[in-house]
Swiss-Prot record:
Family annotation (NCBIfam families): PRK00080.1, ruvB
GO molecular function: ATP binding; ATP hydrolysis activity; four-way junction DNA binding; four-way junction helicase activity
Class in the EC hierarchy, top level: hydrolase
Protein name: Holliday junction branch migration complex subunit RuvB
GO BP: DNA recombination; DNA repair
Domain notes: Has 3 domains, the large (RuvB-L) and small ATPase (RuvB-S) domains and the C-terminal head (RuvB-H) domain. The head domain binds DNA, while the ATPase domains jointly bind ATP, ADP or are empty depending on the state of the subunit in the translocation cycle. During a single DNA translocation step the structure of each domain remains the same, but their relative positions change.
Region (Large ATPase domain (RuvB-L)): 1-181
Summary of the function given for this chain in its UniProt record: The RuvA-RuvB-RuvC complex processes Holliday junction (HJ) DNA during genetic recombination and DNA repair, while the RuvA-RuvB complex plays an important role in the rescue of blocked DNA replication forks via replication fork reversal (RFR). RuvA specifically binds to HJ cruciform DNA, conferring on it an open structure. The RuvB hexamer acts as an ATP-dependent pump, pulling dsDNA into and through the RuvAB complex. RuvB forms 2 homohexamers on either side of HJ DNA bound by 1 or 2 RuvA tetramers; 4 subunits per hexamer contact DNA at a time.
InterPro entries cross-referenced by the UniProt entry: AAA+_ATPase, AAA_lid_4, DNA_helicase_Holl-junc_RuvB, P-loop_NTPase, RuvB-like_N, RuvB_C, WH-like_DNA-bd_sf, WH_DNA-bd_sf
Chain intervals for the UniProt region annotation (Head domain (RuvB-H)): 255-332
Origin species: Streptococcus pyogenes serotype M1
Length: 332
């Protein structure tokens, strides 16, 4: 069953994301440090009439990496061609894409860490010197063809920057670390989305939604839609603070943005293992979730909010976790 707090794209959200996508830096809410840097780099590239250096955007899902890539293209006034690491299966696939680029174009590769190594190696000379050498044929009849490329900008997006190879990472001249959003920025995003979709919501309700959205605009917009449904059926269609509280309680999203699975992880650690340390494999078995799912989907937010610690001997529930769930804390 899909989690409403999953920060990956669900259902038709890709279309919804495009509808809500800001076009320029001044419309982009949050990520102020990244925006400030890109405003300078983009303007400098435009004044020199050069392509922008290659860009690596990294951070958790749902924080606007794809949106930022489109914003950069709009600010530069150039075309953007989009693909993803898993979609580029063979070196020939990438060569075909590169061969279609016009001078100054942006090639955006989402999930770039998932590209096969054989494909990644084609990028090295393309990024550094704007050419590729490709082999045609096989065996004794094989030959190398040199193909010059126009100057272009590669924007790579990843949720797993540590999985990038050193040679690929070194070829990005600009990096942008997308961080979890502050409450005030998420509140503004909720209110902007409500305006676009003609949803009536008061400021306190928007703030409550922001507080429980795990620092992620995609989750905030998803929760807004579900609370809108609740307000339409249970209330008079207007989203108030009270309606928001009731709807999120129905959705099992508590005041800290934890859902039933997050709470199950913490309760299991406290009730069965005295708060830990407990190994990831043991914890995964007890809550009937895959090890990678726990590590990649649930743990990051619990750690970021201070409910969970990773230690050399295992996971440990913090005093904040005990207090939040109403357990007496025993420091062992």
């Amino acid at each position: 069953m899909a989690r409403i707090l999953d920060n990956n794209v669900m259902g038709n959200e890709e279309f919804s994301d495009r509808t809500l996508r800001p076009q320029y830096l001044h419309e982009y809410i949050g990520q102020d440090k990244v925006k400030e840097q890109f405003a300078i780099f983009i303007e400098a590239a435009k004044r020199r009439d050069e392509s922008l250096d290659h860009v690596l955007l990294f951070g958790p899902p749902g924080l606007g990496k794809t949106t930022m890539a489109f914003v950069i293209a709009n600010e530069l006034g150039v075309n953007l061609k989009q693909t993803s690491g898993p979609a580029v299966e063979k070196a020939g696939d990438l060569v075909a894409i590169l061969n279609e680029l016009e001078p100054g174009d942006i090639l955006f590769i989402d999930e770039i860490h998932r590209m096969p190594m054989s494909v990644e190696e084609v990028l090295y000379s393309a990024m550094e010197d704007f050419y590729i050498d490709i082999m045609i044929g096989a065996g004794d009849t094989s030959r190398s063809i040199h193909l010059d490329l126009p100057p272009f900008t590669l924007i790579g997006a990843t949720t797993r920057a540590g999985m990038l190879s050193n040679p690929l990472r070194a070829r990005f001249g600009i990096t942008g670390h997308m961080e979890y959003y502050q409450e005030k920025d998420l509140t503004e995003i909720v209110e902007r989305t409500a305006t676009i979709f003609e949803i009536k919501i008061d400021h306190e309700a928007a703030r409550k939604l922001a507080c429980r959205s795990r620092g992620t605009p995609r989750i905030a917009n998803r929760l807004l839609k579900r609370v809108r449904d609740y307000a339409q059926i249970i209330g008079d269609g207007i989203i108030t603070a009270q309606i928001t509280d009731r709807a999120l309680t129905m959705l099992d999203v508590d005041r800290e943005g934890l859902d039933y699975i997050d709470q199950k992880i913490l309760r299991t650690m406290i009730e069965m293992y005295q708060g830990g340390p407990v190994g990831l494999g043991t914890l995964s078995v007890n809550i009937a979730e895959e090890r990678n799912t726990v590590e990649e989907m649930y743990e990051p937010y619990l750690i970021q909010k201070g409910f969970l610690m990773r230690t050399r001997t295992g996971r440990v529930a913090t005093q904040k976790a005990y207090r939040h769930l109403g357990y007496p804390y025993q420091n062992t």
